[in-house]
């Protein structure tokens, strides 16, 4: 895209999270103030393209846009359901009928996979910014929304711990993460969990019960905190006998059945509170840097890339590479897994590996957090 007046589209797709409005703010500010472009906000992502629903976004109309800095959710709305590819021709036509010169999507890995196909088929000038509280988008260390979600869960764990200790109860706290356990792992360590269960490392009810017994024998503690990602699985879970309740309730029921000692259990499913609220400082910084960079890429005529955060700075990576490697799982051999084990946290039936200095490690994937 040249520096002459162009029309840039932006939308948010997938589940909402803190920092979306902050990213929109950065895109609008840089595109309008630095390049003099027109920015259209597409309402409800691809549904807005189908229905040709868009609103003009500019600093004047948004009151200087300062209000967006700390506003949760998304002013553009979002969707995370529907048969988008089944309406591919309508979606693609919407891009052109709205007169877009380029489109920036703030999205997670599922939406990115679909949008990449649409962009290729429709020959769009397309760019992406990663957002997800699961932090499972590949080739980026952080996605917008993750840091705030971790802090939200940690605050909840702090509150639950005090009531658990007061009544000598074991709390099973279920957090989001169907395929990746980043949120459970980060918040569990920071929030003082005794047990962290994630999809990447199978657990056993026997291992959980033994750890709870160890807490009583070693410290005399009657209470405990179990953080479980919603996609966690047992060592030999029978796929032919699916659960008919939440993973948190399932684990609590199994502990009650198999524990050799009497345990008073409670289950807390944090649910959508993890998606809400004002973004924390890190998410605001990510959103600002990623939004600015996406606009600069459009100005340079560089498309088909996702803005990412690697080693403390904003970089760009091919969307095709991101899609091929999604979702980004927790590495069972990572530093944080070893840290949790070193703190005495049960993270599944996995032995603790010896420490390896990451600066001496040749395989960055294994050594990375």
Curated annotation (Swiss-Prot):
<comment type="pathway">
    <text>Carbohydrate degradation; glycolysis; D-glyceraldehyde 3-phosphate and glycerone phosphate from D-glucose: step 3/4.</text>
</comment>
<feature type="site" description="Important for substrate specificity; cannot use PPi as phosphoryl donor">
    <location>
        <position position="110"/>
    </location>
</feature>
<dbReference type="InterPro" id="IPR035966">
    <property type="entry name" value="PKF_sf"/>
</dbReference>
<comment type="similarity">
    <text>Belongs to the phosphofructokinase type A (PFKA) family. Mixed-substrate PFK group III subfamily.</text>
</comment>
<dbReference type="GO" id="GO:0016208">
    <property type="term" value="F:AMP binding"/>
</dbReference>
<feature type="active site" description="Proton acceptor">
    <location>
        <position position="134"/>
    </location>
</feature>
<feature type="binding site" description="in other chain">
    <location>
        <begin position="132"/>
        <end position="134"/>
    </location>
    <ligand>
        <name>substrate</name>
    </ligand>
</feature>
<comment type="subunit">
    <text>Homodimer or homotetramer.</text>
</comment>
<feature type="binding site" description="in other chain">
    <location>
        <begin position="272"/>
        <end position="275"/>
    </location>
    <ligand>
        <name>substrate</name>
    </ligand>
</feature>
<dbReference type="InterPro" id="IPR000023">
    <property type="entry name" value="Phosphofructokinase_dom"/>
</dbReference>
<dbReference type="GO" id="GO:0042802">
    <property type="term" value="F:identical protein binding"/>
</dbReference>
<dbReference type="GO" id="GO:0030388">
    <property type="term" value="P:fructose 1,6-bisphosphate metabolic process"/>
</dbReference>
<keyword id="KW-0808">Transferase</keyword>
<dbReference type="InterPro" id="IPR012829">
    <property type="entry name" value="Phosphofructokinase_III"/>
</dbReference>
<dbReference type="GO" id="GO:0005945">
    <property type="term" value="C:6-phosphofructokinase complex"/>
</dbReference>
<dbReference type="InterPro" id="IPR015912">
    <property type="entry name" value="Phosphofructokinase_CS"/>
</dbReference>
<feature type="binding site" description="in other chain">
    <location>
        <position position="230"/>
    </location>
    <ligand>
        <name>substrate</name>
    </ligand>
</feature>
<keyword id="KW-0067">ATP-binding</keyword>
<feature type="binding site" description="in other chain">
    <location>
        <begin position="176"/>
        <end position="178"/>
    </location>
    <ligand>
        <name>substrate</name>
    </ligand>
</feature>
<dbReference type="Pfam" id="PF00365">
    <property type="entry name" value="PFK"/>
</dbReference>
<dbReference type="GO" id="GO:0005524">
    <property type="term" value="F:ATP binding"/>
</dbReference>
<keyword id="KW-0479">Metal-binding</keyword>
<dbReference type="GO" id="GO:0046872">
    <property type="term" value="F:metal ion binding"/>
</dbReference>
<dbReference type="GO" id="GO:0003872">
    <property type="term" value="F:6-phosphofructokinase activity"/>
</dbReference>
<keyword id="KW-0547">Nucleotide-binding</keyword>
<dbReference type="GO" id="GO:0061621">
    <property type="term" value="P:canonical glycolysis"/>
</dbReference>
<keyword id="KW-0460">Magnesium</keyword>
<feature type="binding site">
    <location>
        <position position="266"/>
    </location>
    <ligand>
        <name>substrate</name>
    </ligand>
</feature>
<keyword id="KW-0963">Cytoplasm</keyword>
<dbReference type="InterPro" id="IPR022953">
    <property type="entry name" value="ATP_PFK"/>
</dbReference>
<feature type="binding site">
    <location>
        <begin position="81"/>
        <end position="82"/>
    </location>
    <ligand>
        <name>ATP</name>
    </ligand>
</feature>
<comment type="function">
    <text>Catalyzes the phosphorylation of D-fructose 6-phosphate to fructose 1,6-bisphosphate by ATP, the first committing step of glycolysis.</text>
</comment>
<feature type="binding site">
    <location>
        <position position="169"/>
    </location>
    <ligand>
        <name>substrate</name>
    </ligand>
</feature>
<dbReference type="GO" id="GO:0006002">
    <property type="term" value="P:fructose 6-phosphate metabolic process"/>
</dbReference>
<keyword id="KW-0324">Glycolysis</keyword>
<dbReference type="GO" id="GO:0048029">
    <property type="term" value="F:monosaccharide binding"/>
</dbReference>
<dbReference type="GO" id="GO:0070095">
    <property type="term" value="F:fructose-6-phosphate binding"/>
</dbReference>
<protein>
    <recommendedName>
        <fullName>ATP-dependent 6-phosphofructokinase</fullName>
        <ecNumber>2.7.1.11</ecNumber>
    </recommendedName>
</protein>
<dbReference type="InterPro" id="IPR012003">
    <property type="entry name" value="ATP_PFK_prok-type"/>
</dbReference>
<feature type="binding site">
    <location>
        <begin position="108"/>
        <end position="111"/>
    </location>
    <ligand>
        <name>ATP</name>
    </ligand>
</feature>
<dbReference type="GO" id="GO:0047334">
    <property type="term" value="F:diphosphate-fructose-6-phosphate 1-phosphotransferase activity"/>
</dbReference>
<feature type="binding site">
    <location>
        <position position="15"/>
    </location>
    <ligand>
        <name>ATP</name>
    </ligand>
</feature>
């Amino acid at each position: 895209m040249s520096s002459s007046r162009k029309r840039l589209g932006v939308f948010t797709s997938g589940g909402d999270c803190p920092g979306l409005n902050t990213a929109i703010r950065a895109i609008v500010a840089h595109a309008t103030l630095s390049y003099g472009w027109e920015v259209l906000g597409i309402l409800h992502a691809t549904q807005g393209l189908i229905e040709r629903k868009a609103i003009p976004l500019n600093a004047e109309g948004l009151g200087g846009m300062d209000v967006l800095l700390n506003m949760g959710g998304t002013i553009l709305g979002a969707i995370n359901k529907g048969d988008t590819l089944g309406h591919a021709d309508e979606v693609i036509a919407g891009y052109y009928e709205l007169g877009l010169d380029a489109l920036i999507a703030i999205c997670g890995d599922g939406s990115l996979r679909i949008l990449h196909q649409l962009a290729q088929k429709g020959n769009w000038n397309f760019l992406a910014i990663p957002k997800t509280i699961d932090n499972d988008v590949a080739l980026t260390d952080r996605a917008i929304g993750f840091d705030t979600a971790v802090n939200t869960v940690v605050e909840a764990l702090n509150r639950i711990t005090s009531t658990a200790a007061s009544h000598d109860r074991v709390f099973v706290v279920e957090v989001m993460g169907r395929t990746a356990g980043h949120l459970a792992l980060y918040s569990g360590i920071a929030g003082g969990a005794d047990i962290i269960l994630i999809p990447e490392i199978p657990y056993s009810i026997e291992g959980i019960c033994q750890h709870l017994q160890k807490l009583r024998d070693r410290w005399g503690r009657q209470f405990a905190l179990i953080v479980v990602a919603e996609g966690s699985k047992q060592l030999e879970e029978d796929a032919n006998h699916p659960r008919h309740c939440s993973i948190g309730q399932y684990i609590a029921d199994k502990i009650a059945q198999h524990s050799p000692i009497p345990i008073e259990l409670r289950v807390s499913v944090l649910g959508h509170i993890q998606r809400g609220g004002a973004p924390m400082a890190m998410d605001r910084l990510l959103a600002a840097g990623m939004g600015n960079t996406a606009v600069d890429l459009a100005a340079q005529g560089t498309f088909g890339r996702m803005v990412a955060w690697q080693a403390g700075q904003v970089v760009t990576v091919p969307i095709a590479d991101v899609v091929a490697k999604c979702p980004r799982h927790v590495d069972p051999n990572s530093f944080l897994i070893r840290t949790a084990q070193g703190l005495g946290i049960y993270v599944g039936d996995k032995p603790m590996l010896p420490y390896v200095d990451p600066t001496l490690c040749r395989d960055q994937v294994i050594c990375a957090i």
